[in-house]
Amino acid sequence: MKNILPPFIEIYRALIATPSISATEESLDQSNASLITLLAGWFSDLGFNVEVQPVPGTRNKFNMLASTGHGAGGLLLTGHTDTVPFDDGRWTRDPFTLTEHDNKLYGLGTADMKGFFAFILDALRDVDVTKLKKPLYILATADEETSMAGARYFSETTALRPDCAIIGEPTSLQPIRAHKGHISNVVRVLGQSGHSSDPARGVNAIELMHDAIGHIMQLRDSLKARYHYEAFTVPYPTLNLGHIHGGDASNRICACCELHMDIRPLPGMTLNDLNGLLNDALAPVSERWPGRLTVAELHPPIPGYECPPDHQLVEVVEKLLGTKTDVVNYCTEAPFMQTLCPTLVLGPGSINQAHQPDEYLETRFIKPTRELITQVVHHFCWH
């Protein structure tokens, strides 16, 4: 099997050269079909059964599941195929040309995270996958950078229940067993326009929003006081007011005001509970001004996530790497994979390179990442 696949660096080069940008703006958004075709071909060459799954509600996006072995359990290695858009003016290199310089591999997706599939393929090139005693699954998802539609759809529709999963996001090979969630909402207040010379003839949406913000700040303080998870650097749920806009002229009563806010819940906090707390906080404003205040999602919410600290996956990975698992504040697809099986986030490259111009992965990660993948496959699929 050694000669079936291109060399590691050529696999990496081909992945980076295949654009797969996800963006909410349609003009920037791209299908990942070409990248999925590449991956499907390579995993087929290694003897995997490959299924390509269209993801509903997306602009021609696909998941790919490569599987081998029979029976229950096994290991799932997973990652996303898409990247964020890039600012051409801030890149000093071609984002779609893999460039090696100063012990770094430069290119869009080198760290976050198309390169992870090159590591998987390279680690498996000399493995006879037909002889594995438990199943091995490779999942490539769509739209992680926007809606996480691929991971959501896969977790909702699959019957697979592996023993455990590893998501190869860039963690500098530091295993992550928990992270916060993310909820982003828009609060809209509808007033009544009028001339500013007679305020009583209108309803000023900015004034109503001022009242609403006061109640939201009380909720922020309540969340901070009620919920704690000491392992996080910020050990409580955060609430941020990120954007506000209202009105169109200084001499007009504001007819509409819109506030964008987010909450980052701790693991174990349900999205329904948080939505209930927000609605309860804003209830006094809604009761005083019926029909004038609404709350809606800006993006599909992401729950917090935690892998049980005493699970075998945590024990095995900590032993292999000689380091303890950690927790982080950013989000991944882990909450959706965790509904299927215990999941860790663990991969090469630094999260500090994610979404940055001149993104790179340090070559020092190449050898230990290959070894780690080989070891976890051996442990969970051969034993």
Swiss-Prot record:
Top-level taxon of origin: Bacteria
Gene Ontology molecular function: acetylornithine deacetylase activity; zinc ion binding
Major enzyme class: hydrolase
Co-factor: note: Binds 2 Zn(2+) or Co(2+) ions per subunit.
Enzyme active site: D82, E144
EC number: 3.5.1.16
One Gene Ontology CC term in the entry: cytoplasm
Known pathway: Amino-acid biosynthesis; L-arginine biosynthesis; L-ornithine from N(2)-acetyl-L-ornithine (linear): step 1/1
Protein name per the record: Acetylornithine deacetylase
Gene name for this UniProt entry: argE
